[in-house]
Structures are given as C-alpha cells and as structure tokens.
Amino acid sequence: MNYSSNWALRLLTIFLIIGAFNITNAQNLKGVVTDTSGALLENVGIFNQTSGQHSHTNLSGLFSLPSSQINDSIYFSNLGYKTFVLVVNQNHLSEGVEVILEESSINLDQVVVVSKVDAMSRIVNVDIQNDPVKSSQEILRKVPGLLIGQHAGGGKAEQIFLRGFDIDHGTDVAISVDGMPVNMVSHAHGQGYADLHFVIPETIDNINFGKGPYYADKGDFNTAGFVDLNLKKSIDKSMLSYEAGQFNTNRFVGLFNILESSKSDAYIASELYLTDGPFHSPQNFNRINILGRYHYKDIGKEELTLTASHFQSKWDASGQIPQRAIDQGIIGRFGAIDDTEGGQTSRTNLMLNHTKFLGEDQFLKTRAFVSKYDFELFSNFTFFLEDPVNGDQIRQYEDRTIMGAETIFEQIDIPVGTDDRFKYSAGLGFRHDNVDDVSLAHTLNRKTILEQYAFGDIDETNIYSFINGEYTTGNWTFNPSVRLDYFKFDYENKLSEAYDNKSESKAIVSPKLNTIYTFNRNWQMFLKTGLGFHSNDARVVTANEGQEILPKAYGLDLGTIIKPTDKMVLNATLWGLLLNQEFVYVGDAGIVEPSGKTRRVGVELGGRYQLSDWLYLYSDVNYTYARSTEEADGEDYIPLAPDFTAVGGLSITDLGNFSGNLNYRYLGDRAANEDNSIVAEGYFVTDLNLNYEIKNWTIGLIVENLFDTEWNETQFATESRLFNETASVEEIHFTPGTPFYLRGKVAVTF
C-alpha cells in the first residue's frame, strides 16, 4: 500500500512538473514585422506550425502569438514578400523579435489559410496583383461569381450580377471606397445605384469583399454581399501613361508623388478618358477624374488620411435595341432606334480616415465623408409605345448631398486562459442623404419636358451601431455579432398643389454568427449564418405607408478553403439565401412593384495554381437556383437571374521583360421573364493584355474580345413599338457587347 501510494505520488508529481514546465515555457512571442526599408507591415499572417496558433500584425506592424515555445516554427506571410520561417529560441521569447520580410513577386506561396472570415479576399488579391485592372468597375469582376455589364454609352453605372441576383446597378451589394459608400439610396434611376467611375484604377491598392449578410459592419445593401476598394495611401514613384486605340479612344493618366517624408506622404492622380465607342452614332464619351491624397503616420500614436476627389463625365448612347429591328434590316447591331439617349454626372468627395492608437492592442478608428453628386440621364426603352408621335424618351434627374461618419473601437488581443484569445470591435455611425428635385419626366430630344411623371425631394437618414466579437480556442474561431439599423424616410411630392410630405421610420436588429475550424495553416472550413435586410427606396416606403419597410434576408454559407500544396488553393461553398416580401421602385416608370418572396441556393467552386514563378492560373465556377416561392411552378423564374457563370484566366509575370494576362468570362442563358418563354442569351468572351518593360518604360497592348465574339452585354425583356408598327411586341432588347477592341499603351515611371 505504501509503495503504491508513493509511486502514485511520484507519478502525480512528475505530471505536475511537466504541466508547470509547459505553462512556464509556453509564452507569448511578441515582435514587429518590417520590410527591408524599415517600413512597418500591417496584416502580415503569422502561423505557429507546431502549436497551430495564429495571429496578424496590427496597424503598427506589431504582433503577439500565444503558446509559443523554443524550437517552434513560425511562418510569416504577406503578399508581395518572401515567406519567412522563424525557429523560436529563448532570446525571442524573453526579448521579442524583429522580422524583416524581403520583397518578391506575388505568388500563392505567400497566402496562409487561417481562421479569417475574409480569407478569400486575401487569395483574390493575388489575382489582382497578377492582373491589374483597366477600369474601376472592372475590379468588381475580381469578386468570384460577380459579372457586370454596361448599357448606356459608358457613363452609367454597370449592371451587376451576383449569386442569382440581377442586382441592377447595386441594389443588393454594398460597395464602398475606403469605407465611403458608393451606393445611392432612393436614386433617380433605381435603388442602390453604384457608380464607381470616380475611382482611378491605378490608385487601387486592394479589394476586400464578402458574400451574404454575415458582416456586422455592413448594413444597407449587403444582401448578396459587399465590396470595399482600398486606395493606395502612398505611391513609390510618379507615373505618366497614355493609351490610344480603336473607336477614337484616348486615355491619359498621371500619378505624381508630391510629398515623401518619414511621417507624411502625398500624391495627386488624374485621368482623362475619351472614346466614341463601336456604335454607328458616336458616344462622344468623356470622363475627367482628379484625386489628391495626404497620409500621415506617427508610429504607435495615430494615422491620418485625407482624400479629395472630383469626377465628371458626359456621353451619348444608342440605347437598348430590339432584335426584330435588326432582323428586318432597319438597323445593324451597333445602330440605334433613338440615338439622342445619353447623360451627364459628377461627384465630388472629401474623406477623412483617422486611427488613434490607445495602446498596443487598442485602436479608435474614425472616418467621415461628404459628397456632392448630380445625375441626369435620358433613355428610351419603349420607343413609340406610349407616345406614337413624340416617342417615349424619359429624363431622370437628381441633385444630391451625402454626409456620414463612423467611429469604431477595436481591442484585438485579449488573453483568455493560456491559449485562447478574444477580440472585439464596437461601432457607431450615420449616413444622411439630401436629394433635391429627384424627377422622372417625359421629354423630347433632350430639350423639351412634355410631362412630369414624378418630382420631389428626399431626405433619408440611417443611424447604426454594431458589436463584433471573435473568440479563438484551439482550432475553432467563433465570430458572433449583431447590428442595429434605424432608418428615417421623408419624401415631399412636389407635383402636388398642396404641401405633400410623407415620413416613415423603422429599426431592425440583424444578428450574425460565423464559425471557422482551422485544420492547419493551409486548410479551413467555415459555417456562416446571418440575418440582413433588403434595402428599400424612400418612395416605396412612403407609398406603402411603412409596410414591409425592411424585408428580412436569411443567409447560410457552408464551405472550405484548402491549400493542398504551396502552389495551389481550392475553395468550395454551398449557400442559401431567403428574401421576404419586398417592394421595388421602378425608376424608369415611376411605379412601385411587389416582387414577392424569393429563394436562392447555389454552389461555388474555385481554384488557383502557381504553375511556376512566372505563370499563374485561376478559375471560378458558380451555379445558382433562384426562384420565387409564391408563384406556380414554371412561372416562378426570377427575370435575368444568372444560374451558371464562370471566370478564369492565366497571368504571366516577370518572364524576362514580359508580363500579360489572358482572361475569360462566361454567363449562361437565363430566363428574361417569369415563365422562361423569353431567354437572354449567354456569352463567352476573352480578353488579352500584354506588357513589355524597358527600364522605367512600359509598352502595352490591350485587346478586349480577342476572338471578336458577337455577344449581348445587357438584355431585357421589354414591350416596345417601333414607329412603323401598329402593335407592340415584347421581346429581348439588348446592348451589343464590345467587338474586337485594340488599344496600345505606353507608360513611364520617374
């Protein structure tokens, strides 16, 4: 008995000693990450290969990695830098560590798949760095499964397709630039109108995106997803670029580094774009952009970015044409029934982004913005259906001022026990839109107003708050969050002889929960669930006296991201989205239409492969089943909802002096009306981009639609009547896609 007791006591003592040894030797590894010039690197991925713990550098390049022991292998990864592996020694644990990353070409070796809710954004940014975009709207195509189409002379915001939504110009996807919203509430042309043309593509640094209503810091318009573009805080070199090509196309771009010091940077960017397009009636398109940006950073204390920009454009358009007009030989594919369509628009922005460092792991982020915006658009979709003498041209107009602000407190590293970590953020903000003279009118030749269909002033305010938590224990990460939105809608009908102002308000709570399981640094699985809401127009809300102001959206994603080798990344997602009853304001007709409840389910597959240091391949395939749940079978199609899409390509970088890209996009046939009796034809289009560098000079070749495919960029089932017709016809009306389009480019950096 005594011998057994003594043995048991000795064994217990040994276990306690081992446990105490592990506790005292499993420590926080702290340090800083910089590049070779000493610049601090933010958001560097850090992974302990031995323990499975992971972290990221903060805004000051600092990091803390729990459960680190001597001889652990720590991986440091960041896009554009060689992956660095640190073997921990006692000095690292007691004194901290400074990690210096060397710059290199972008490749998949630098991607670590850990428990990040936005892990796909980091992967897609490899695509962007390997294939720089040629327009600000084009960057939206970098979001897997998102396609766009232009149908009004290049000046309108593009039509967007994502996850079984014909999003029109932005109704169900929240788009922002450095946190400043792009979508326009209660817009003259339609809810959520998102014109990104005020962004100069050469100033884009990276893109952050997410699909579904799973993100507490995103509210209005975040149904199918969100996209946030981040602009460069500074530029390394100044640059001049000139581009010329078919259809009288000319584009001038200049980026000028005007200030560079230890704490401050500033640059100015400008763009002038001119083209007539491939249409028989010249588009006479012109766009001017100018941007100025100042960045100040006092390490460990504060960071400030001030941005001012102005954009304006003007254009003519040939509009959407009916197939029968081509079949009868009245016009060609690039002709027009009414070539007096077109418009003009402008936007001026002032932005402030400020971060106050309250401590090593605490930040207070504040951003504020004000925008002045105007819009005028002339369209004719039905030709002579309503007015057989003067035609059906309409004018949509508005004059808008937007202002908003947001403050977020972040605590990014709170120890919970020995290994677990918790972080959270809490935010409060508002947005206010003052829209004057928003109108829809029947016009003649852009000169004469024949009748006002709608005319009024809109004031809309959104006040919101949210709290977002993230708890990591072992291989699990739990991300619960909740958002509160309050909306106030006011619409004054100025067509009424008496004062006619209607007002409604509504609040909604949107909880979300994302769960991630990380097998290792190269494999994660995730389950995302969330409640959101479908954005609504003030004219819808007041017309329906507050009924179904903010119809709920219920979302669920189940998926995985895996790196089977250092050179390959694969992803797969099953998802579903249910939308409650919604009312839609049809800006082209000035009427309110109910669209009923809808259900969308789908699967997304993607792959990226770094075949060599200079060759990169990628592809994304998406299938969606989208139906109305309140209609009979066969009559429950959602018009223009895409069911099968695919994008992909290959990129060549640093092959001697050469670089280039070959990309494709595919959109399958889809129903254009509720019973699928009218079909919008799909397309497969390929683009090519080649560059040759000589010292600080770059000579480039850009080819859109390499194989000169005949395709329809945007399509609608529309009832119209031509001047010589006695009865109307409903059929596909479309804007033809760009034919073979060749441009040359020369750029110099200095």
Predicted regions and their residues:
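Transmembrane beta-barrel wall of Gram-negative outer-membrane proteins
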Residues: 241-274, 279-318, 342-359
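Gram-negative outer-membrane beta-barrel transporters
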Residues: 409-412, 487, 575-578, 594-674, ...
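Short strand-turn segments of transmembrane beta-barrel domains in outer membranes
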Residues: 206-216, 224-259, 270, 278, ...
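Face-selective signature of the C-terminal outer-membrane beta-barrel domain
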Residues: 300-311, 343-494, 522, 564, ...
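Extracytoplasmic beta-strand/coil segments of soluble accessory domains associated
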Residues: 137-184
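C-terminal beta-signal and adjacent terminal beta-strands/loops
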Residues: 617, 669-670, 692-750
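Short acidic/polar hinge/loop motifs at secondary-structure boundaries
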Residues: 64-66, 181-211, 230, 545
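Short, acidic, small-residue-rich periplasmic hinge/interaction motif at the N-terminus
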Residues: 44-49, 77-81, 92-130, 137, ...
